[in-house]
Design a protein with these regions (language model features):
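Extended amphipathic ligand-handling, pore-lining, and cofactor/metal-binding catalytic surfaces
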Residues: 1-176
Length: 176
């Protein structure tokens, strides 16, 4: 959003849709989608790209919500940031299930899915004694995830995000 704000004067109007995980309701919908798409008796590890910024907290929140909804054998890990491979490895060991399915938590299952998930993470888990399957289907291939993005785009078309400082200025001026 900050990058686009610099370009705003050059356009009549710019709208930016929200990311997949923005509201608590978004997280709940994604938990419902993941649990419906990847149900089973084995552990499932969704691997996101991650980041070293505070935005990485969204992965931990999603992991927490999966567990809170009763999906204790579904885990979220990240290539960069938290939850790290080491964090997820401890959780997988506590599942007492030696079969794991790796799934990219990425819109497109591209280079990271092949190089990091299907190669590095799979190999590291196999060295720890796990039998590992991979499902390299990107989130963008799931119709219910597509619907969430469409919902966010429609919302952005109909409602303009108001910056908090602009909102506070308006409130201050109304009080005068």
């Amino acid at each position: 959003r900050h990058e686009i704000e610099n370009m705003e004067p050059q356009f009549k109007d710019i709208r930016i849709g929200n990311p997949l995980l923005y509201t608590v309701e978004d997280y709940e919908k994604v938990v419902d989608v993941l649990s419906a798409e990847y149900k089973g008796n084995n552990s499932t590890l969704f691997v996101g790209h991650g980041t070293y910024t505070p935005a990485t907290a969204c992965y931990a929140m999603l992991d927490y919500m999966l567990k809170d909804k009763g999906f204790s054998q579904m885990h979220i890990g990240t290539i960069e940031g938290y939850p790290s491979f080491e964090t997820v490895l401890r959780r997988l060991k506590s599942d007492q299930n030696n079969q794991v399915t790796l799934v990219p938590f990425m819109f497109v299952a591209g280079d990271h899915a092949v190089n990091d998930i299907d190669t590095e993470w799979k190999s590291a888990l196999e060295k720890e004694g796990f039998r590992v399957n991979t499902n390299l289907r990107g989130l963008g291939e799931i119709p219910m995830i597509q619907d969430l993005f469409i919902e966010h785009a429609r919302f952005a078309c109909n409602y303009k995000m108001v910056k908090i400082l602009d909102k506070k200025k308006r409130y201050a001026n109304e009080g005068n």
